[in-house]
Amino acid sequence: MNSYFTNPSLSCHLASGQEVLPNVALNSSAYDPVRHFSTYGEAVAQNRIYSSPFYSPQDNVVFSSGRGPYEYGSNAFYQDKDMLSSCRQNAMGHNTQTSIAQDFSSDQSRASVQEQKTSIQIYPWMQRMNSHSGVGYGTDRRRGRQIYSRYQTLELEKEFHFNRYLTRRRRIEIANASCLTERQIKIWFQNRRMKWKKESNLTSTLSGGTGAASDSLAEGKEKEEETEEEQQKE
């Protein structure tokens, strides 16, 4: 019954040279509860002594130091972990080096672009040429033409039909109603009066006689409006 202990093919040794199964006496107290079975008897109890070592020959191979074809020591797993950690560290170092190189190249390109911008010499003809497109290099840029909406032009035309000259109070009211500034309304009325004068001159030349009188009255009203604005500013 004790052939398992004497079989040399099943012997497995630890790294320190000790056997896996210690030499424990059969009359030890550790096997007392295993011996006494009421159903199977003493022979069956002796066979049941091999509780844990019977299933552990393959598990104990892991702790061997010879490293046969199917044996792997505990150091092999730690070596693999060390190799993985070293590979990760090398990859991280490579990534940091590439990011630093990219940042350095981008900084150099920005510095070169700024140097090119500062080295460009601006001439007056460049300012005049690009002033109409809104890309002026100097301070003498022309202001863009004001575009009025349909609602704004309709309100201004109605006001011009009744009053060709506006007071400051009326100009403020129209500016609040049409979402425009006083200066924009003033310029629009000036342009509209010039257009109206040209139209009236054409009609007077065709009909004859009354054109000069209407022009003199319009000029007098414009002068009165300018003097009134100057007085309000003072």
From Swiss-Prot:
Disulfide bonds: none annotated. GO terms for biological process: anterior/posterior pattern specification. Residues 200-234 are annotated as: Disordered. Its main location: nucleus. Sequence-specific transcription factor which is part of a developmental regulatory system that provides cells with specific positional identities on the anterior-posterior axis. Belongs to the Antp homeobox family. PANTHER family: HOMEOBOX PROTEIN HOX (PTHR45659), HOMEOBOX PROTEIN HOX-C6 (PTHR45659:SF1). This is Homeobox protein Hox-C6. It comes from Notophthalmus viridescens (Eastern newt). The gene is HOXC6.
